[in-house]
Regions:
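Mobile, glycine-rich extracellular loop/lid and propeptide segments
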Residues: 136-143
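Bacterial signal peptide processing site
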Residues: 19-21
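Parallel beta-helix/beta-solenoid
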Residues: 129-135
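Sec-dependent signal peptide recognition
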Residues: 2-12
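Glycan-recognition patch characteristic of GH18 chitinases/ENGases
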Residues: 26-129, 144-146, 152-164
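C-terminal motif of bacterial Sec signal peptides marking the signal peptidase cleavage site
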Residues: 15-17
C-alpha cells in the first residue's frame, strides 16, 4: 500500500509539472517569449534546418575577415539567406552572423590599424542590412594567441578593444 501511495504522489507531481505555466518575458528582448536566450549555432556546411519553436537566437557559422582585411567573406550565402528566412515563421527569432571561429585568420591584421577596423565595421553594417540580420558575433579565437595556428600580435588585446568600440 505504501508503494501505491508513493507512486500516486509521484504521478501527481509529474502531472503538475506538465501544466501550462505562463512564461516570463524578463530578458529585455522584445518578442522573446522566454526568460532565457536559447541559441543554436547553424553551420554553413549543414543541410538540416533547425526547429525554431524553441529558439530565441541563431548564430550562423561562419563569416570570415576578407582577404583585404576590410570586410567580411561569408560561407554559403544562399544558406544564410535560407536561415534568415526562418524569421518569417517566427518573427521574434534573432539571427546573427558569427565571424571567425577556430582557425579563422586575419583578425590580427584587420584590427591592427584604424582604417581597416573602420572599413570592417562598415562592412558589418552592410552585411546586416543586406541579409536582414540582427547582429554580428565576433568570434576571434583568441586575441594575442596563435593557439589556432593563426597570426597574432602582442597588441591584439588592445586592438580588439578598439575594434569593439
Amino acid at each position: 500500500m505504501k508503494i501505491f501511495r508513493l507512486l500516486s504522489l509521484l504521478l501527481v507531481v509529474l502531472l503538475a509539472s506538465c501544466l501550462n505555466k505562463k512564461k516570463s518575458a524578463d530578458t529585455g528582448i522584445p518578442g522573446n517569449e522566454s526568460r532565457y536566450v536559447v541559441l543554436a549555432y547553424v553551420t554553413s556546411w549543414g543541410v538540416s534546418t533547425p526547429e525554431t519553436s524553441c529558439l530565441t537566437h541563431i548564430n550562423y557559422a561562419f563569416g570570415h575577415v576578407a582577404d583585404d582585411n576590410k570586410g567580411i567573406r561569408i560561407d554559403n550565402e544562399p544558406r544564410l539567406q535560407m536561415i534568415v528566412g526562418l524569421k518569417k515563421e517566427k518573427p521574434s527569432l534573432k539571427v546573427l552572423l558569427s565571424v571567425g571561429g577556430w582557425g579563422s585568420s586575419r583578425f590580427s591584421e584587420m584590427a591592427a590599424n584604424d582604417s581597416t577596423r573602420t572599413a570592417f565595421a562598415a562592412d558589418c553594417r552592410r552585411v546586416i542590412d543586406k541579409f536582414g540580420l540582427d547582429g554580428i558575433d565576433i568570434d576571434w579565437e583568441y586575441p594575442g594567441s596563435g593557439t589556432a595556428g593563426i597570426s597574432f600580435s602582442s597588441a591584439d588585446k588592445e586592438n580588439f578593444t578598439l575594434l569593439m568600440r
